[in-house]
Amino acid sequence: MAPFAVLFVLVFLVPIIVSIRSSFFAQVPSGDGLYGGGELVDTFVGLENFVTAATNGAFWTSMGRVVLYAALQIPVMIFVALGLALLLDSFIVRRPTLFRLSFFLPYAVPGIIAAMMWLYLYTPEVSPFLPFLPEGTDFMAPGTILFSMANMTTWTYTGYNMLIFLSALQAVPRDLYEAARLDGASGFQISMRIKVPLVRGAALLAVLLSIIGTIQLFNEPVVLQAANSWMGKDFTPMMLTYNTMMGEISPSGSGPASAYSLLMALIAGVLAIVYALLQRRKGDA
């Protein structure tokens, strides 16, 4: 228990405490320079960083963008993941371990590498399949870029969520299925009336993790932004936070970046809690 507690404190609690502390400070000139500038020093600014973050229109625009992205991507990914899990849990598929591994492999690919691979597939000059699509197809146009990113993350995380559903399905007593078959239920009826209702908890977990992951969307837009300057450095909240930290966006530094990150965590938590409460109310109805 002690090693776990030490790791929990070092890996989880300490970064949160450091981030909270940093959010109340900003780097300002000391005033000791020849023209009043001088060395940058950490100065306590109270809630100023949070006020700046909360009133920054670019932050809320990027947040609205990822919320729209989540509304497009999460339902599709969860539906596909559940469908694959139901298929692997049935007696239709032989060698389910092989299929399980093949579906999970995209998740094992590092995020940046996967994003670069999709950038290659989306680039007209080098893509092997774009020449076969209708002329004018552009996966990186302003009107299609969210769908393109949704496709990238769905490819990556469907296998991961499939394993969550499959673990829940395999925990269901097989006696329930046998009893249903004796009563004349078809495979489809067993799936819809027994399996799907019993994996509601797994679905809740998968959606909550997806919501949190969506707020942190970073790899895909960063890689695509390198080839599409119109996206800007604040296309997603995570990009805005990172570029604020790196001095690409003003006000910059660890203080404003920490305020953005804590605001993102608060929004992700609120969205997750609201979804969980809605699902609980639906389950009690």
What is the role of each PLM region?
Residues 1-285:
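A structural signal for multi-pass alpha-helical bundles of membrane permease subunits
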